[in-house]
Amino acid sequence: MVNIAGPPPREVLEGPILAVSRQTKANIPGAPERKSFAKITEPIEVPGLLDIQLNSFAWLIGTPEWRARQQEELGDSVRVTSGLEDILEELSPIQDYSGNMSLSLSEPRFEDMKNTIDECKDKDINYSAPLYVTAEFINNETQEIKSQTVFIGDFPMMTDKGTFIVNGTERVVVSQLVRSPGVYFDQTIDKSTERPLHSVKVIPSRGAWLEFDVDKRDTVGVRIDRKRRQPVTVLLKALGWTTEQITERFGFSEIMMSTLESDGVSNTDEALLEIYRKQRPGEQPTRDLAQSLLDNSFFRAKRYDLAKVGRYKVNRKLGLGGDNEGLMTLTEEDIATTLEYLVRLHAGETTMTSPTGEVIPVETDDIDHFGNRRLRTVGELIQNQVRVGLSRMERVVRERMTTQDAESITPTSLINVRPVSAAIREFFGTSQLSQFMDQNNSLSGLTHKRRLSALGPGGLSRERAGIEVRDVHASHYGRMCPIETPEGPNIGLIGSLASYARVNAFGFIETPYRKVENGVLTDQIDYLTADEEDRFVVAQANVEHDADGKITADSVTVRVKNGDIQVVAPESVDYLDVSPRQMVSVATAMIPFLEHDDANRALMGANMQRQAVPLVRSEAPFVGTGMERAAAYDAGDLIINKKGGVVENVSADIITVMADDGTRETYILRKFERTNQGTCYNQTPLVNIGDRVEAGQVLADGPGTHNGEMSLGRNLLVAFMPWEGHNYEDAIILNQRVVEEDILTSIHIEEHEIDARDTKLGPEEITREIPNVSEDVLKDLDERGIVRIGADVRDGDILVGKVTPKGETELTPEERLLRAIFGEKAREVRDTSMKVPHGETGKVIGVRRFSRDDDDDLAPGVNEMIRVYVAQKRKIQDGDKLAGRHGNKGVVGKILPQEDMPFMPDGTPVDIILNTHGVPRRMNIGQVLEVHLGWLAAAGWKIDTEDPANAELLKTLPEDLYDVPAGSLTATPVFDGATNEEIAGLLGNSRPNRDGDVMVDENGKATLFDGRSGEPFPYPVSVGYMYILKLHHLVDEKIHARSTGPYSMITQQPLGGKAQFGGQRFGEMEVWAMQAYGAAYTLQELLTIKSDDVVGRVKVYEAIVKGENIPDPGIPESFKVLLKELQSLCLNVEVLSADGTPMELSGSDDDEFDQAGASLGINLSRDERSDADIA
């Protein structure tokens, strides 16, 4: 079997080796070490951040690496099966209706991929490998066995970055959070009696729900598959229990005994018929039908499946032991124990003895607890689709077994693979969980792959989800981030996996804890699920301990069950968090001083980092958190060296390394490619020829990374002060230097595609010969009619010339005769060239041509397809949105000349002015601390160890932070960063500039001077470096204006929105405003000739062109629509003229309107449809 697209080589992905390779990342040439303020040493590294995707897919297809890992963990005695093997085993054998013939499928295997990832993107096809299975047909009558290898279809493969290529675009399959199969006990309060009533649901992975409940009359009832309720003893009797057996098992319960007395059935047959009547009302019941209905509902594996996770949950909840682990259907013992649990819960008991003798707690379940919610990861989601496809195929196989001749049947003649490939294709193309990958920057892609969604098939819907399911739960700790979730209708339904979390075999999220024994920390790390964690006492990572790991504090604050906080002795602690950042996601862990930010703003900060566009020059933040390197490393956008060796060759697009073992590794860099979001994907080398490189070292940066660290923005010198009202309400004032030096400049690439098709009137043609177009317009087109690379284009310019045959009018017999004698005249064609869309400019950086003549695979009816890539360099400008990492966002309100900006005592002008009002009420104080530490990192500091005033400071800081040079990078990890006292102390010890002056005092403030007058401002101002991101909300993509354009077919009013080239809506309230000002003529103009007076607007255009006065408006179309609406309600409404005669409002002026348009040579409606559609 060929290893395809499983996880990357193990040294990059696995635990301890990963930790080693992370250490080597510090040795990147030119990569400075971050000075960390962390006090806590983490016992383990952050695990592979893409493992949730890669491991799940590796399980599905059973890669050799995955099998080796499983064998290592489970031992050789346990058989390891992949997800595809499981599903084929579950399906096989498929038997015909008589049981004489059977077909078994096994041994799925993959052949080599047909295309590389780049070829798939280029040709708009799927990145997939052919899947084959061994099909074995057995004729039980003749004992004949026929075995064949059958091609099932092309199976989409995961790239080593955890994505899929579907139809040439990169997609991500998001993990789904669903309620786990199992048994759930619930309590509700009866409104009339105010007594607690209890119920239980047995929820399978597939099949009928079984619900028991106690009602206010104290009878125990059952509902099968949400049908009508009946006494529970009817079900027990239908299962073959006698009254004596029921009394023996449930005699302790009065409510069960009273239910038994009043159930109205005396034996098994009556009970079965009673159940059948309730389940299938209106049908004539028989004993056999009733028996098979009950068996099919709960005891047949084809119809009822608890799944491994469901069996595990049932056994765990009811204390049933592991004897029935392989059984995926319900047993009578399951049902009886569930009932016993329910009646004891209703009676108020707190414990019970299970059938295996185990004492188990009796309590209701919290459905929002992460012990009761599990993840369907990518492998399981695809497996479910394969199951759907195979079950559809199974029906076809059965039918063919009965219709074909038994002698001539072969496995290939029975199998129709279309349903399987259709189910897989449908999932990747249309499922809510298969999403267009967010490639805005490296972080957004990484976060997308780690996303957890409660939406989708089998999950919740936005409308039905209440507050409880969206809320943060104590069991999310270390599993799902409490901060990172969208604002808006999906809040709380979409989350992000926490930094250290992993998913176990059952789909439950586990988080690591460090074992504590008798108050002493050990090196043992245990991964616990949420319900396992409830049994232990867990302390925070910042517990004080000595060098031997013994906890020194007299008492420790801990978490116990349900997230309650207690203070206990060190000996009572079972576990310790492995890291302070364990509870938050990757994006949240990249917010410095997170502990000083309000949660709402931190949420915005985490989300806005994903919207940052990669800049032309990336710069690592002065103030980081230590997560930047791990995030960039695992995001998959860096080029990482596989083997130690020496760099042999470096260019902009290729790096060659001669490895120590004599092999040569070549790495190809991706240059100026377009991402899904239109940002620029570019990789740049970090090494030089002759450099020694180790395995795991970064060779090249990707977009938005710098020296192997995630670098989404730039460090700018910021001053917190109001300035002439220009930064009122979160507006931002920028220095012109930022524009001139391309500090916040980004490159955006747009793709334009056109195809030449066969039409009814003949084929379209890509050509330079375009009718009625001057040579000046064609200057940048080559001889084929395609724009040259390097051409500067703007809106309206032709990118690809194309002509489409025009429909010819019916010829008279005389004309036909003349045509036959003198031959064809030049065919009539019209210009349908591809032009640069409105509002876009840029430089052509790439052209791809696909043609049927070159054997390219094109859609039916398409002869040629051209793709043109236009790149645009966007400098920062008024109206662009900027943000920090703390949810502090704003729009550029003014760009000031450098000489007008406030400047520091040494003459340095600040880069950006933020308003102070943006801080206090939003409670994101982290940004202020970031500014102070940013200044320190840029200026450097040196602590005078002899000065007694620094004694406290020296105690808290490690030695490598005593003397730090200017321009250093610092790390302040979340919940374990620099304290206020440390920052204040360091500000008092910051290094002076070259003139020997300290610019910023110990309060973090400086005296600023007004750039216009040179006078100092009256108060000191907080100044320092803040990391600023440029977000994707760019004014270039939002600004829009329309003169003429398309109109709605019904109302004849202009369309709305930039995409439709629409107009501005002049709504009801705007009309009131015009009325209030008495602007009658302006209002009339807005409601008629500028909107839906069809004839009037053409006449106005004509008047403007000819320089005449504007004519009077006519009747708007919407008035005619209103009349027709009233007439359709049988109300005879007429319009009377001034003299009382009825007026005709039909389109009598249409001819005049057409003539006016034709005479002016205009098409006022600017029909935006593609010309191919018209043809």
Swiss-Prot record:
GO terms for cellular component: DNA-directed RNA polymerase complex. One of its GO terms (biological process) is DNA-templated transcription. InterPro entries: DNA-dir_RNA_pol_bsu_ext_1_sf, DNA-dir_RNA_pol_bsu_external_1, DNA-dir_RNA_pol_su2, DNA-dir_RNAP_su2_dom, DNA-dir_RNAP_su2_hyb_sf, RNA_pol_bsu_bac, RNA_pol_bsu_CS, RNA_pol_bsu_protrusion. It catalyses: RNA(n) + a ribonucleoside 5'-triphosphate = RNA(n+1) + diphosphate. Keywords: DNA-directed RNA polymerase, Nucleotidyltransferase, Transcription, Transferase. It is an enzyme of class 2 (transferase). GO terms for molecular function: DNA binding; DNA-directed RNA polymerase activity; ribonucleoside binding. It comes from the Bacteria. CDD domains: RNA_pol_B_RPB2. Residues 1165-1175 have a biased composition (Basic and acidic residues). Residues 1142-1175 are annotated as: Disordered. Belongs to the RNA polymerase beta chain family. DNA-dependent RNA polymerase catalyzes the transcription of DNA into RNA using the four ribonucleoside triphosphates as substrates. The RNAP catalytic core consists of 2 alpha, 1 beta, 1 beta' and 1 omega subunit. When a sigma factor is associated with the core the holoenzyme is formed, which can initiate transcription. This is DNA-directed RNA polymerase subunit beta. It comes from Corynebacterium diphtheriae (strain ATCC 700971 / NCTC 13129 / Biotype gravis).
